[in-house]
Amino acid sequence: MAGRPARMHEMEVLAPRRDIEPDLRLTLLSGFELSFRSRQVPLAPSGQRLIAYLALQDRWVPRSLCAGTLWPDSPEAHAAANLRSVLWRLNVSQQPLVETSRSDLRLASTVHVDVHEMTRRAEHLLRPGGPHATAVREGV
Protein backbone atom coordinates (compact mmCIF):
# COMPACT_ATOMS: atom_id res chain seq x y z
CA MET A 1 0.00 0.00 0.00
CA ALA A 2 1.49 3.30 -1.07
CA GLY A 3 2.10 5.82 1.65
CA ARG A 4 1.76 3.24 4.41
CA PRO A 5 4.27 3.90 7.21
CA ALA A 6 6.71 1.06 7.77
CA ARG A 7 6.18 -0.94 10.92
CA MET A 8 9.10 -1.27 13.30
CA HIS A 9 9.50 -5.01 12.64
CA GLU A 10 9.67 -4.29 8.91
CA MET A 11 12.68 -2.01 9.36
CA GLU A 12 16.18 -2.70 10.53
CA VAL A 13 16.49 -1.34 14.05
CA LEU A 14 19.91 -0.03 14.98
CA ALA A 15 21.36 -0.94 18.35
CA PRO A 16 21.62 1.96 20.79
CA ARG A 17 25.03 3.53 21.22
CA ARG A 18 26.79 2.24 24.32
CA ASP A 19 28.27 5.62 25.28
CA ILE A 20 24.87 7.26 25.72
CA GLU A 21 22.66 6.56 28.73
CA PRO A 22 19.35 5.14 27.44
CA ASP A 23 16.28 7.30 28.00
CA LEU A 24 14.07 4.34 28.90
CA ARG A 25 15.42 1.79 31.36
CA LEU A 26 13.62 -1.27 32.70
CA THR A 27 14.93 -2.99 35.81
CA LEU A 28 13.58 -6.45 36.56
CA LEU A 29 16.37 -8.12 38.53
CA SER A 30 15.78 -6.19 41.75
CA GLY A 31 12.04 -5.67 41.28
CA PHE A 32 10.08 -3.88 38.58
CA GLU A 33 11.15 -0.33 37.91
CA LEU A 34 10.72 1.64 34.71
CA SER A 35 12.51 4.95 34.39
CA PHE A 36 12.64 7.68 31.78
CA ARG A 37 15.73 9.87 31.93
CA SER A 38 16.41 8.59 35.46
CA ARG A 39 12.90 9.44 36.71
CA GLN A 40 10.64 6.61 37.78
CA VAL A 41 7.60 6.01 35.56
CA PRO A 42 4.58 4.75 37.50
CA LEU A 43 2.63 1.95 35.83
CA ALA A 44 -0.46 0.05 36.93
CA PRO A 45 0.20 -3.60 37.86
CA SER A 46 -1.35 -4.83 34.60
CA GLY A 47 0.99 -2.56 32.63
CA GLN A 48 3.96 -3.81 34.65
CA ARG A 49 3.02 -7.42 33.92
CA LEU A 50 2.76 -6.78 30.18
CA ILE A 51 6.03 -4.84 30.02
CA ALA A 52 7.88 -7.47 32.07
CA TYR A 53 6.43 -10.31 29.97
CA LEU A 54 7.44 -8.67 26.69
CA ALA A 55 10.91 -7.86 28.06
CA LEU A 56 11.49 -11.49 29.01
CA GLN A 57 10.22 -12.76 25.66
CA ASP A 58 12.59 -10.40 23.79
CA ARG A 59 10.81 -11.00 20.47
CA TRP A 60 7.53 -10.35 18.68
CA VAL A 61 4.74 -12.15 20.55
CA PRO A 62 1.24 -12.84 19.21
CA ARG A 63 -1.39 -10.69 20.91
CA SER A 64 -3.47 -13.79 21.63
CA LEU A 65 -0.54 -15.40 23.47
CA CYS A 66 0.03 -12.25 25.56
CA ALA A 67 -3.64 -12.05 26.48
CA GLY A 68 -3.89 -15.75 27.31
CA THR A 69 -0.72 -15.67 29.39
CA LEU A 70 -1.54 -12.54 31.37
CA TRP A 71 -5.23 -13.37 31.94
CA PRO A 72 -5.34 -17.20 31.89
CA ASP A 73 -8.61 -17.47 33.83
CA SER A 74 -10.51 -15.05 31.60
CA PRO A 75 -12.47 -15.96 28.49
CA GLU A 76 -10.48 -15.24 25.32
CA ALA A 77 -12.57 -12.18 24.37
CA HIS A 78 -12.25 -10.70 27.86
CA ALA A 79 -8.47 -11.31 27.95
CA ALA A 80 -8.13 -9.63 24.54
CA ALA A 81 -10.16 -6.65 25.80
CA ASN A 82 -7.93 -6.42 28.89
CA LEU A 83 -4.85 -6.39 26.66
CA ARG A 84 -6.28 -3.63 24.45
CA SER A 85 -7.07 -1.59 27.56
CA VAL A 86 -3.53 -1.96 28.94
CA LEU A 87 -2.03 -1.05 25.56
CA TRP A 88 -4.24 2.04 25.36
CA ARG A 89 -3.15 3.16 28.84
CA LEU A 90 0.52 2.59 27.99
CA ASN A 91 0.09 4.54 24.77
CA VAL A 92 -0.62 7.81 26.58
CA SER A 93 3.03 8.17 27.61
CA GLN A 94 5.33 10.31 25.47
CA GLN A 95 7.76 7.44 24.94
CA PRO A 96 6.35 4.35 23.23
CA LEU A 97 6.89 1.30 25.41
CA VAL A 98 5.36 -1.33 23.14
CA GLU A 99 5.74 -1.77 19.40
CA THR A 100 2.65 -3.21 17.78
CA SER A 101 1.54 -4.78 14.56
CA ARG A 102 -1.94 -6.02 13.71
CA SER A 103 -1.27 -9.38 15.37
CA ASP A 104 1.92 -9.06 17.42
CA LEU A 105 3.58 -7.04 20.18
CA ARG A 106 7.07 -6.52 21.49
CA LEU A 107 8.82 -4.25 23.94
CA ALA A 108 10.02 -1.11 22.19
CA SER A 109 13.61 -1.44 21.04
CA THR A 110 14.39 1.86 22.78
CA VAL A 111 13.86 0.31 26.23
CA HIS A 112 17.13 -0.80 27.87
CA VAL A 113 16.44 -3.96 29.92
CA ASP A 114 18.79 -5.03 32.72
CA VAL A 115 18.09 -8.73 32.07
CA HIS A 116 19.22 -8.35 28.45
CA GLU A 117 22.41 -6.60 29.53
CA MET A 118 23.14 -9.32 32.10
CA THR A 119 22.57 -12.00 29.45
CA ARG A 120 24.92 -10.27 26.98
CA ARG A 121 27.63 -10.00 29.62
CA ALA A 122 27.26 -13.65 30.64
CA GLU A 123 27.42 -14.77 27.00
CA HIS A 124 30.54 -12.66 26.52
CA LEU A 125 32.20 -14.24 29.54
CA LEU A 126 31.27 -17.76 28.45
CA ARG A 127 32.16 -17.33 24.78
CA PRO A 128 34.39 -20.23 23.67
CA GLY A 129 37.99 -19.12 23.83
CA GLY A 130 37.03 -16.11 25.89
CA PRO A 131 39.20 -15.07 28.83
CA HIS A 132 36.84 -16.43 31.48
CA ALA A 133 35.11 -19.34 29.71
CA THR A 134 37.42 -22.10 30.94
CA ALA A 135 37.51 -20.84 34.53
CA VAL A 136 33.72 -20.52 34.69
CA ARG A 137 33.12 -23.97 33.18
CA GLU A 138 35.62 -25.57 35.57
CA GLY A 139 34.27 -23.72 38.58
CA VAL A 140 37.52 -21.87 39.26
Model-derived segments and spans:
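Short, positively charged loop/turn segments that connect secondary-structure elements
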Residues: 71-81
